Amino acid sequence: PDLPYPAEDLGFKPEHLEIVRGAMNRVTNTDEGTAYRYTQVEEPALQIAGKTGTAQVARLSVGERLRMLNDVRSLDYNRRNHALFVGYGPLKRPRYACAVIIEHGDSGGRSAGPVVLDLLQAAIVGNSGGQPNMVNDRYNLVGRNDEA
């Protein structure tokens, strides 16, 4: 549906917005992107753009950081980083935006990225008369009981 009123112009220069959009596109749609493995889709109409984030919860020793790189489950649940992802879609003609924070999710791209992808795709497909296809089994979440 169209907005009941036009979106307010925030005064950003178009060339600056293009730089940000290009960077967010690379995060999700190029193999150099930090969320590429978790948000890549073949259908252009369902592609999104986004930005990953991680919020450190606790100060970690060098040993803890090295262990966490090898296996996040080796770190106590309450000391694991929070995972963040913000995105918009569809890529070519954005209509929807979404942000997800997963407490102690470790990685924004790996944990929160697929959730944002599914939510945005559900909005895109659902509002075009189609049936959303949620792929929950791809979420790579590590919970309190270390069940991946």
Show which residues each predicted segment covers.
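Active-site beta-strand/loop architecture of penicillin-binding DD-peptidases
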Residues: P1-D9, E15, M24-G130
